[in-house]
Amino acid sequence: MASVFVGCSGNDPADAIGNADPTTDQGVSFSLTEPDFGEEETMGVRSCNWKNAVDTTDLGDGVLGEVSMSKEQGDITTRAATRTLSNGRYTVLAYDASGSLKAKINATVVSGEFSSKDIMILEPATYTFVCLNDKVDLSEGGVISVSQANAATARIGRTVKSVSGTRMKVPFVMYHVGLRVRVSLEAMVNIPNNVKAMIFDDSGNTPTVTNYDPITGTYSAGAVGTFSGPEEIFPSTGSTDFTKEKYISSPKSNTYHYLLPNQSSSIQLKFTSGDQIYHKDLAGRTMTPYKNMVLEPNATYLLNVKLTKVFKYVFDDGTVGFLRNKGTRKPIALVISETDRSAIALHDANNGVQTIWTVKRNDYNNPVAEYPSQRDQIPATSQGLHWTWDASGSKDGITIKANEPVKCPAFYHAAHYDPGVVVTGTNLSKWYLGANTDWKNLYLYVGFGTNTKVNANSSPCPWYYHVIDKAFTDAGGTTVSNTDPNASSNALRKYWSATYYRDFDTGLMHIFKNGYTDGNHSISERDLALIRAFIHY
């Protein structure tokens, strides 16, 4: 049986108590609608005055975690008043212009219906009406509050209406008090296996109880503490598709975390386990989005962690670093191995014109003792500089191939590559024709190919050609990939290698438009291929 409070001249809402006559032509009845969590809004664009919605955590070695927090598109379809409402107890409060509580109804919804006796009799005036579901606490002193345990289910509706004395219906839109957060991982390469992470806020300022001001319709922390969500598993995106520009993984269970509104959140995400990504361990790494976030009630937030790779470059003065710190320096080469201290030129040599390797390979070749087998493991140290610039790197022990534009054009044009700027770094080697080691390093450490034992005898191997393209173009370079939109999927670009195999002839790097690479070979002395220079720093 519903209690009815009739507002009188006093401030006591219990001045008159009884059940209203449902046939009366006076009084206020109520209807409820229950919308889902709100629609998407990128933080910093609408209501939140953020200067920056993205924060970056440096994981080292050029791996960055770009963390953003945005409002997501939710199901904004509002349940019509005639649709089934959530069963339970509802409390309706009426406050006058001075903020005094004038009336209160405790009503129960069964099978989606309010009792016809749930009517409030009020004197003509303007009132603030507030409706609470049974997950909202109302103290004897009139304090409205919600605990963290009820963040997912507590709802409050509020509206201001003028009562004239005739029968009227006041509609409530019952919004969620809490907000929900889901986490998504994004990367330029496949999300690896065994990735687990959890969100938390250990600042000590997370609301564990939130108080609601019915007059202003605002929330404030009633009690604060810490928050720790459950560990979530992020499925791998696989290991066979290398063609996408981005790979996304979201947990299949525990999709949402529910929190109370917060004017200054410091939510973070910590990886608790996971295989390597970009050759970097994830476990133990913590990602922090933009601090002091305003988390609003009834909102759906996406905490997106974008794991990106930025590369180091060799600059004109011989220094090495990231583009973000380049200042007035000019990049001339992309670092492919910090172990071998090697880098690849940003553009093709010889203005992109193909040439032969040497005119007579029997005469102008590498030393016979230095011919590897196509099945040999590719060495960690490149011989390219030696074969290009040392007389001892030639078969006859006399010829310096770097100085022979007619006899050894591939070596010559690599050795005389012009990066377009004056190079002043005294620590830099001369430019050279890259060997199999250099091309393998490009495949593994820039293209993030997965065959760590790749050699000239290997079958074609895929790499992340979008990452390759970005690494070159970010620095104003020309990618080694085939970007011709009219080319067929098996169209390729061929680059010379400085390596000559005893059972495979001259090495080539085949780069197919479909994202595959292949350490191939050239048999004919008339074969033409492109030239890309390399350098040591």
Annotated model-derived regions:
Residues 88, 177-179, 340, 429, ...:
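Residues that flank catalytic or metal-binding motifs in active/ligand-binding sites
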Residues 295-352:
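GGW-centered surface loops in extracellular recognition modules
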Residues 494-496, 519-537:
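Short, structured beta-strand segments at or near domain termini in extracellular proteins/domains
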